[in-house]
Design a protein with these regions (language model features):
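Short beta-strand segments in beta-sandwich/barrel cores
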Residues: 27, 54-58, 100-101
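Glycine- and acidic-residue-biased ligand/ion/polar-headgroup-sensing regions
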Residues: 34, 45-56, 73-74
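Short phosphate-coordinating micro-motif centered on Lys-Gly-acidic
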Residues: 37-42
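Ligand-binding loop in jelly-roll beta-barrel domains
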Residues: 65, 84-107
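A small-molecule sensor/coupling module
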Residues: 89, 108-145, 149
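Phosphate-/nucleic-acid-contacting segments
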Residues: 144-191
Length: 191
């Protein structure tokens, strides 16, 4: 979990007091590529720490997948509406690559929140930042042409273009796989 600790410290969080106990309370799990981590309808209040790999949030409507977000390590994630132990997930969370993940159970998170007041602040700020970034990205995408969306994706997520399937990128950008294929062909012809 060293990558995630450095990530938090780079953001200005002091995790030195609670890190040892935090590390003892998480469990490690390796998710293989395409494995579903959380499914819709599942009660899941776990907090996941993505140490290596890449995951996506997606839903399925009338047999069609809609990718809502893609996260790269290091980061933390949870079911969007499954943070409360009584709430039910409305999304799939899937490992897009083999991913090393640490899982913090709700009881352990509550214990750490009580013992270390700063721990809750880290979680609250992290999930607020995640939500804010998602809203900004969603708004930005609506204002761009499909070509601009793809160019923005290449600029801001350069490692993902060759790492994950193109149909997932197309879904994330809100365009069809065929449109993405045409855009890519035009861009590569210009090079």
């Amino acid at each position: 979990m060293n990558r995630y600790r450095r990530f938090l410290e780079d953001k200005g969080y002091d995790v030195s007091k609670q890190w040892a106990e935090f590390s003892e309370r998480v469990t490690y799990r390796k998710f293989i590529q395409n494995e579903i981590i959380v499914s819709p309808g599942e009660k899941n209040a776990n907090i996941y720490i993505l140490e290596t790999g890449c995951i996506r949030y997606f839903t399925v409507n009338d047999g069609k997948e809609f990718t809502h977000d893609i996260l790269e390590a290091p980061s933390a994630f949870a079911s969007m509406f499954g943070i409360d132990a009584n709430e039910i997930s409305t999304v799939n969370i899937q490992a897009l690559t083999d991913s090393d993940v640490y899982i913090l159970k709700p009881d352990d998170a509550e214990y750490l929140n009580t013992k270390y007041p700063g721990f809750r602040q880290i979680g609250d700020r992290s999930f607020t930042e995640f939500g804010k970034n998602r809203i900004l990205q969603s708004g930005k995408i609506k204002m761009m042409s499909p070509k601009e969306r793809y160019l923005d994706f290449l600029e801001n997520r350069p490692g993902l273009a060759n790492l994950i399937p193109q149909y997932i990128i197309a879904s994330y950008l809100g365009i069809t796989p065929e449109s993405l294929s045409r855009i890519r062909k035009r861009l590569y012809k210009k090079q």
